[in-house]
Amino acid sequence: MTLPLSLGPVRPVPLSAINPVAQLGAIAVVLPVLLVSGDLLTPLVVLAAEVCLLPAAGLTTPRTVLARTWPLLLGAAGVAWVNVLFGDAGWASGVALAVRVLALALPGVLLVASTDPVRLADALTLHWRVPTRFAFGTLAALRLVPLLAAEWQTIRLARRARGVEPGRNPVAQGRLFAGTAFALLVAAVRRGTRLAAAMDARGFDSGIARTNARGSVLRRRDAAYLAGAVAVCAAALALSVATGTWEPVFS
Amino acid sequence: MRLTGWGFRYPSRHAWAARDVDLRVDPGERVLLTGPSGAGKSTLLHALAGLLGPDEGEQTGEITVDGRAPAEARARTGVVFQDPDAQLVMTRAGDDVAFGLENAGVRPERIWPAVESVLAEVGFPYGRDRATAALSGGQKQRLVLAGALAPRPGLLLLDEPTAQLDPDGAVLVREAVARATGARDTTLLVVDHDAEAWLPLVDRVVELRPEGGAVEHGPGWRPAPLRLPVRTPRPAGAVLLRAEAAGYTHRGAEQPALAATDVAVPAGRTLAVTGPNGTGKSTLALLLAGLRPPTTGRIAAAPALTAGLRRPDRPPHRWRADELVRRIGTVFQHPEHQFLTGRVRDELALGPLRSGAGDDAAHRRAEELMERLGLAALAEANPFTLSGGQQRRLSVATALATDPAVLVLDEPTFGQDRDTWGELVALLAEQQRDGRALVLVTHDAAVVRALADDELALQPTPVPA
């Protein structure tokens, strides 16, 4: 099972040419439109546009798409199912809700699939003045995630080696899980402290104005991408209003 | 850099981490700072790096770098610590080297030429775009070194930079240090208890004493030889455990972590498992220890080992944990992974209690082990607060508490100074005399010489073209 979130350098795909802040901007455009539209047609049009972008994000085969979106698909299906079971509006509203969830989350998938985390941090600090301590600190912390996964395995095995095993008793399983989680937390804090010391020793956040070796340029195509997002939303709204299906959630 | 009567004490500790240290190092000198664990080597280095503020503890005497307080001179100081994974920030090699230059506010157009030249200087064999996650430990540490050197520090501090690496990785790092400091425009201070390896690279050797003070060793000084235990080779006893074409492949991985391996573990003998990183040494240890099921082949336990099991036909990884600890004991590379209680005494009693011993019997066993392994004074201490050497002895003791016939140890001498090394090797030799079978996974050639009857040298699996 592949994690849908990649932490290493991302192989460039066509969509990588769009600056991460432009992609975040597009999400900011799509978000309110989807949040207020309670009908099926509006999110469906937006979703269709997003699906067209999947190949540009390097997600060309059903397999790669599934690898990135399985938690999302599962979530959308769950939302729809719960709505059908417990809601009073039946199938149609369940499906509309699922499509909205997908349309809301897919831009995030596009961003993650096409964006190198380092480039994202560069763009955020240079264009949106996000504090470097936060952006690069998060980046450094993300690097530790796969290491912690390996550590979790080791701690679990080490407990069996000490004769501690829960067997089939769920209470004992819960306690062992909590114990392992605590040991992992201790390990994570220890590693994190060392990483922070190493970053301090390299002059991170020492009060000198930080430069950025890679830079982050906003080009005309970034504006075009944003305009595209606005156009898709406008078209979706226009279409659903024209056909009389538009249905704001707060009415 | 200059220290006069310098000392430091952490707020939660009674004893001084370092005291009465006088040291003067002139620009361009290359100094090795050595001494036993707990003598305050790392504390001194942190102080020089300007990482010990007034909040961290109490300081006496004077410490200056370039005539200034270390924190003010931080921009002129580069540091390399032990764990490469806790030092790399970026996902690409070049970006990581650039990190320090960016922090120093160097203009972007001057950064990349500087990165290229420092990568060449440390002999980094890959391009700037290489993913840091795909590097070996030695290459990662070379990259960390390049990152520390990139801002052209006047003082380079190395805190046991090879302690977490295999011998090949350690050689890579020492070569890189030799190349990078050859021009002598950087003052070098290395902290390491493996003095021998650094001797050719340094001009002076200074030893910190645990009781305080520092001793300068003259030219031609050599560290005391390792104390090897006297061993009487025994004929191999009955085979207890056997790997039959046992191999392991991680789920989703293309290459096996361990290629199919055959090996026998007889009573009263010590098997050393050696070989470069990535050949599956630790994986083999986990299979033999009954902690992981092999994905190919099998691990077979002899009747001598399976006697008393409820289901003796099952392989070790299917045994219940309490049955396992009475037959096969495992000591992990990092002792903290194994500690489960808040007191040394409880830690030792845990295994016996788990495997069905009564309260009295379990605590008697704990007393006896503490007495024998010199841990009695620490009975009430928290295992996590012990020194590296003490933690290691305790982790071996916890495995012995349930009296297993087979003892599997992963890198038992890792990070130990010469004194604790000697104690540990003597302890293991004793286990072997008692008729236990030992499996040692190790990079340490000295421990193989000191203890092993048989050696299994794992080879890298050829990568198909």
Predicted regions and their residues:
Chain B
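Conserved ABC ATPase signature
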Residues: A131-L135, Q139, N382-L386, Q390
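ABC-family nucleotide-binding domains
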Residues: D159, D166, D417
